């Protein structure tokens, strides 16, 4: 796909070329979206709205590190919805990985998570964050064991992936109401890149076939159930709910 590729001063231009080849990215000088390699990380920018800043994946520091250390742990809604209990740590396929945040929370609690991401730019961002995380002394060991990335379309991969996971987790893109600065920033940049998941409804059926225990679907609190199929149960938070479909 076409995107503006930028190598900042101090970054490795050959690494950017290799990255573009790996993910099938073609430089387009006029593209609004830019993938920027800085000396620290790979990030996504919206060139016509520079004040939004860059979006990148960081499992080592910042928000995700704080959430790992001081978040709700097993009390987090996503952990409850997945079904983590005592010694039971389900295996998970996160079929709409995005920036990998929920997958990271679940991996930090001990679950093995295989992430699927079909968009090459998002997959590149996520892989960059994973590679830096793998090298970290504190989290690198378990991160390599518990979080892996597959660049593939969920619709086809859900029919082929082996072994079967206990849980399939879905968090498809949905048009967000503008409630917070974070949502405004990330959703404006992300939706400019990938748009809404127009085919999201088609994920539920193959997910239910694949999962051994349950499918969990994260939805905004105002959104209808995925594919119009009512869930058997749900875990709710202030802005979201996690719809649960037993298998």
UniProtKB/Swiss-Prot annotation:
The residues that the entry says bind S-adenosyl-L-methionine are 101-102, 117-118, 153-154, 171
Q: Which UniProt keywords apply?
A: Cytoplasm, Methyltransferase, rRNA processing, S-adenosyl-L-methionine, Transferase
NCBIfam families associated with the record: PRK10742.1
The protein's location, in the record's own words, is: Cytoplasm
Q: Which family does it belong to?
A: Belongs to the methyltransferase superfamily. RsmJ family.
Q: What is its EC number?
A: 2.1.1.242
Is Transferase found in the keyword set? yes
UniProt-listed InterPro entries:
16SrRNA_methylTrfase_J (IPR007536), SAM-dependent_MTases_sf (IPR029063)
May I have one GO cellular component term? Answer: cytoplasm
What is known about what this protein does? Answer: Specifically methylates the guanosine in position 1516 of 16S rRNA.
Name the source's superkingdom. Bacteria
Q: Which Pfam families match?
A: SAM_MT
Q: Which reactions does this protein catalyse?
A: guanosine(1516) in 16S rRNA + S-adenosyl-L-methionine = N(2)-methylguanosine(1516) in 16S rRNA + S-adenosyl-L-homocysteine + H(+)
The protein, known as: Ribosomal RNA small subunit methyltransferase J
PANTHER family per record: RIBOSOMAL RNA SMALL SUBUNIT METHYLTRANSFERASE J (PTHR36112:SF1)
The record lists the membrane-crossing segments as none
**Any GO molecular function:** rRNA (guanine-N2-)-methyltransferase activity
């Amino acid at each position: 796909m076409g995107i503006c590729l930028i190598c900042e001063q101090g970054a490795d231009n050959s690494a950017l070329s290799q990255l573009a080849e790996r993910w099938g990215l073609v430089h387009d000088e006029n593209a609004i979206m830019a993938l920027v390699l800085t000396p620290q990380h790979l990030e996504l920018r919206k060139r016509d709205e520079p004040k939004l800043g860059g979006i990148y994946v960081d499992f080592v520091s910042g928000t995700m590190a704080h959430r790992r250390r001081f978040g709700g742990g097993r009390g987090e809604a996503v952990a409850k919805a997945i079904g983590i209990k005592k010694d039971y740590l389900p295996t998970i396929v996160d079929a709409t990985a995005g920036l990998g945040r929920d997958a990271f929370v679940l991996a930090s609690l001990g679950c093995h998570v295989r992430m699927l991401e079909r968009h090459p730019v998002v997959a590149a961002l996520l892989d960059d964050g994973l590679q830096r995380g793998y090298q970290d002394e504190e989290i690198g060991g378990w991160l390599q064991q518990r979080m892996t990335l597959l660049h593939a379309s969920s619709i086809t991969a859900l029919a082929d992936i082996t072994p079967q996971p206990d849980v399939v987790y879905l968090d498809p893109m949905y048009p967000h109401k503008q409630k917070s600065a974070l949502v405004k920033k990330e959703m404006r940049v992300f939706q400019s890149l990938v748009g809404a998941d127009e085919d999201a409804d088609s994920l539920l059926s193959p997910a239910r076939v694949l999962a051994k225990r349950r499918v969990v679907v994260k939805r905004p609190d105002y959104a209808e159930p995925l594919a119009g199929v009512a869930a058997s149960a749900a875990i709710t938070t202030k802005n979201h709910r996690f719809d649960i479909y037993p298998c």
